[in-house]
């Protein structure tokens, strides 16, 4: 495994660890999720280029489309929660709270 793949896998693991550690704030969770998506995009692009799969060049583009949709929905949810509650805590999303 080349060193760039190891670095990208470490970036993915660091983003996942950040997602687990900073899961109380929505903004931190969204940033870690974007880091995970970016490392998945780079890794899939490098894999496709190294293996020379000519039929699967659209997979990284599809991954970017899903990442953009996830970012837009996440930011809309962040704005909604911060407008309603004044904080970006994920526990504010619990509908069973009184």
UniProtKB/Swiss-Prot annotation:
Signal peptide: none annotated. It comes from the Eukaryota. GO terms for cellular component: mitochondrial inner membrane; respiratory chain complex I. One of its GO terms (biological process) is ATP synthesis coupled electron transport. Core subunit of respiratory chain NADH dehydrogenase (Complex I) which is composed of 45 different subunits. The chain crosses the membrane at residues 2-22, 29-49, 61-81. Keywords: Electron transport, Membrane, Mitochondrion, Mitochondrion inner membrane, NAD, Respiratory chain, Translocase, Transmembrane, Transmembrane helix, Transport, Ubiquinone. It catalyses: a ubiquinone + NADH + 5 H(+)(in) = a ubiquinol + NAD(+) + 4 H(+)(out). It is a multi-pass membrane protein. It holds the Pfam family Oxidored_q2. This is NADH-ubiquinone oxidoreductase chain 4L. Core subunit of the mitochondrial membrane respiratory chain NADH dehydrogenase (Complex I) which catalyzes electron transfer from NADH through the respiratory chain, using ubiquinone as an electron acceptor. Part of the enzyme membrane arm which is embedded in the lipid bilayer and involved in proton translocation. It is found in: Mitochondrion inner membrane. Its main location: mitochondrion. Its EC number is 7.1.1.2. It is an enzyme of class 7 (translocase). Belongs to the complex I subunit 4L family. GO terms for molecular function: NADH dehydrogenase (ubiquinone) activity. The gene is MT-ND4L. It comes from Microcebus jollyae.
